A protein has these predicted regions:
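Short, conserved beta-strand element in jelly-roll/cupin
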Residues: 53-58, 67-85, 124-126, 221-224
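Short histidine-centered beta-strand/loop micro-motifs
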Residues: 63-68, 110-113
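Structural motif
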Residues: 74, 81-83, 90, 108, ...
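A short, N-terminal "cap"/entry segment at the start of jelly-roll beta-barrel domains
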Residues: 1-48, 136, 140-221
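Short acidic-glycine-tyrosine-enriched beta hairpin
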Residues: 88-103
């Protein structure tokens, strides 16, 4: 007989709408509003990884373009059609697309919403590390405000886009070919797994960490 579903859920089961913060995220000295976040990882008791649900209204971005020395990051598009800003170029994304940013590569990134509709993202990364350093290629004024500036970031070729959401620049700066750090789960699934000696099929999955070269986070898309 199937177990009865419980009417009351434990504290580590929550809906993102009950956790969303106020719409005031911005950099010091700037009145530009960024994404609206819900800190899922912290609210659910996770201490080693950070997981956020983020909403991007039209014309906003998740952050200034940046690269980090010691913290990995992963972005999954739940809804909408944002652009991934990577090393000065825009790459269009859609629902089900995933982007991975290994630490220490100097790969500069941000997610921009140049569309007319809201975008929803699931963003995962490592919790803040004291040894982490950060670099803002388009905002050098941040250097004076931060003690964690990344001075010896690996050099990378930079494209012409300045990282600011601007629908008038969108078509001229958008790239056609995708980078290896952008994948859609629908083209990457592996056959359903099962335990040895048992023919019960489990979930059908995609190992994003392995595909992106992310070594300190285990990130999978699973379909049941």
């Amino acid at each position: 007989m199937p177990a009865r579903r419980q009417p009351d859920r434990p504290d580590f089961i929550r809906h993102w709408t009950t956790l969303e913060g106020v719409d005031d995220a911005a950099y010091e000295g700037s009145d530009e509003l960024l994404s609206i976040g819900a800190p899922l990882g912290r609210a659910l008791g996770l201490t080693r990884i950070g997981i956020h649900h983020e909403r991007l209204p039209p014309g906003r971005r998740t952050s200034y373009p940046h690269a980090e020395s010691a913290e990995e990051e992963f972005v999954f598009v739940l809804q909408g059609r944002p652009d991934a800003w990577i090393d000065g170029r825009l790459y269009p994304l859609g629902e089900g697309d995933a982007v991975g940013f290994p630490a220490g590569t100097g790969l500069c990134h941000s997610i921009l919403n140049n569309s007319d509709d809201e975008v929803r993202l699931l963003v995962a990364g490592e919790r803040s590390k004291p040894e982490n350093r950060i670099y803002y290629p388009c905002n050098p004024e941040q250097r004076a405000r931060r003690a964690d500036w990344w001075d010896d970031v690996p050099p990378r070729p930079m494209g012409p886009h300045d990282g600011v959401p601007d629908r008038g620049r969108r078509d001229s700066a958008k790239e056609g070919a995708r980078l290896a750090c952008i994948l859609n789960w629908q083209g990457e699934e592996q056959p359903a797994d099962h335990y040895a000696g048992d023919d019960e099929k489990m979930l059908i999955g995609v190992d994003f960490s392995n595909r992106f070269g992310i070594t300190r986070l285990g990130i999978h898309h699973g379909r049941l």
